[in-house]
């Protein structure tokens, strides 16, 4: 049976990425060697790294605009530390918008480096919305936000325009929608949502904002060191980067971000329309802030849980259970999830309605 993978991450990837990755593991570029055993300094992998970095900037519309794309290790969680290390000045200040678990994790790390101003938070409402009315201090070294919140199913639809560097954690919605990415000075994202398997982290940074903290930065945490080493300061995670390149190529061939945005909108509209129509269900996020990537919803009557769980599992749906802090269900609709998989879930929801 075909599986419909709604996992929040690591998540579904395009079928062609699996097929090409499998071949590369057996014989990479007809070299007679596995991708898993080649030197990261070989011309074949250097070409992979160069193409991947260039394709990131091309897809985001940042080519030739003073940005560098890096493939690092440590996940987005390490970026919680690296961002203030590289951007918050000695005795400096940073402004953070608290919209969920990952934003609060970033705030926790930033507090070790200087004054960390939480300009707004939706924590008291269990992060069911994105705060709208807030003021960003003009003397902050940077402003940090999280564009999409996988656990609580909210997503920022607009971003403030300020005269300080803007940093954004886009781990769960990068490459999913059209934005003016030049409004951001630093973007970071764990690969395992819309780009590839777990194991590498993408950082896109405008070079001109670096080197201004006045502090010593350990080499492995220094963006400038990684830029100078062309993202190979140490041995990079070869396989995740190669798989990420394949996903980026797939996205480009599909028509780029504008093309995938239309598909993602169609998927989200289909599911949210059913959640709103079907009286057995209710969404957990405020309607205006609903995420196109992660739809969170509950059954109005928990007595129907066992039946619904059996029905969606029997339909080949996987990974639909919600995070423990929210409960209910979470349908993660990342780029590679086809519209037909969302239709299968909607059909199950309608079938439950007919049975009750």
From Swiss-Prot:
Subunit field text: Homodimer.
Family annotation (SUPFAM superfamilies): PLP-dependent transferases
Location(s), subcellular: Cytoplasm
Chain's role: Catalyzes the reversible conversion of 3-phosphohydroxypyruvate to phosphoserine and of 3-hydroxy-2-oxo-4-phosphonooxybutanoate to phosphohydroxythreonine.
Disulfide bond sites: none
A GO term, aspect molecular function: O-phospho-L-serine:2-oxoglutarate aminotransferase activity
Binding of pyridoxal 5'-phosphate, residues: 76-77, 102, 150, 169, 192, 234-235
UniProt GO cellular component terms: cytoplasm
Protein name: Phosphoserine aminotransferase
Top-level enzyme category: transferase
Keywords in alphabetical order: Amino-acid biosynthesis, Aminotransferase, Cytoplasm, Pyridoxal phosphate, Pyridoxine biosynthesis, Serine biosynthesis, Transferase
Main localization (coarse): cytoplasm
Ligand binding (L-glutamate): 41
Modified residues (N6-(pyridoxal phosphate)lysine): 193
Cofactor: pyridoxal 5'-phosphate
Organism: Flavobacterium psychrophilum (strain ATCC 49511 / DSM 21280 / CIP 103535 / JIP02/86)
Pfam families: Aminotran_5
Keyword Amino-acid biosynthesis annotated: yes
Reaction catalysis annotation: O-phospho-L-serine + 2-oxoglutarate = 3-phosphooxypyruvate + L-glutamate; 4-(phosphooxy)-L-threonine + 2-oxoglutarate = (R)-3-hydroxy-2-oxo-4-phosphooxybutanoate + L-glutamate
Membrane-crossing segments per the record: none
Pathway per the UniProt entry: Amino-acid biosynthesis; L-serine biosynthesis; L-serine from 3-phospho-D-glycerate: step 2/3; Cofactor biosynthesis; pyridoxine 5'-phosphate biosynthesis; pyridoxine 5'-phosphate from D-erythrose 4-phosphate: step 3/5
Keyword Cytoplasm: yes
């Amino acid at each position: 049976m075909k599986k419909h993978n709604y996992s929040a991450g690591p998540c579904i990837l395009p079928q062609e990425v699996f097929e090409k990755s499998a071949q590369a593991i057996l014989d990479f570029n007809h070299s007679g060697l596995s991708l898993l055993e080649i030197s990261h300094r070989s011309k074949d992998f250097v070409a992979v790294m160069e193409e991947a970095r260039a394709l990131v900037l091309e897809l985001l519309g940042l080519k030739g605009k003073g940005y560098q794309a890096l493939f690092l290790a440590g996940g987005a969680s390490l970026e919680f530390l690296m961002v203030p290390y590289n951007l918050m000045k000695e005795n400096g200040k940073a402004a953070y918008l608290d919209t969920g678990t990952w934003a609060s994790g970033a705030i926790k790390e930033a507090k070790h480096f200087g004054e960390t101003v939480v300009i707004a938070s939706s924590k008291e409402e269990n992060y069911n919305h994105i705060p709208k009315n807030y003021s960003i201090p003009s003397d902050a070294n940077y402003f940090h936000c999280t564009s999409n919140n996988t656990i609580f199913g909210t997503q920022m639809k607009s971003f403030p325009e300020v005269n300080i560097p803007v940093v954004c954690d886009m781990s769960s919605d990068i490459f999913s929608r059209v934005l003016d990415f030049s409004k951001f000075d630093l973007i970071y994202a764990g690969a395992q949502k819309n780009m590839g398997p777990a194991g590498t982290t993408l950082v896109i940074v405008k070079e001109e904002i670096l080197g201004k903290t006045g502090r010593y930065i350990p080499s492995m945490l220094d963006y400038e060191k990684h830029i100078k080493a062309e993202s190979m300061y140490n041995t990079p995670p070869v396989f995740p980067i190669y798989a990420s390149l394949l996903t980026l190529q797939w996205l480009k061939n599909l028509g780029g971000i504008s093309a995938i945005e239309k598909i993602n909108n169609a998927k989200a509209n289909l599911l949210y329309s059913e959640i709103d129509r079907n009286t057995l269900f209710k969404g957990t996020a405020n309607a205006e802030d609903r995420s196109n990537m992660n739809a969170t919803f509950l059954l109005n009557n928990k007595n129907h849980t066992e039946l619904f769980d059996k029905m969606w599992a029997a339909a080949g749906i996987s990974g639909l259970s919600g995070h423990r802090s929210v409960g209910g269900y979470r349908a993660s609709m990342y780029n590679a999830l086809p519209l037909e998989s969302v239709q299968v879930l909607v059909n199950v929801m309608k079938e439950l309605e007919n049975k009750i």
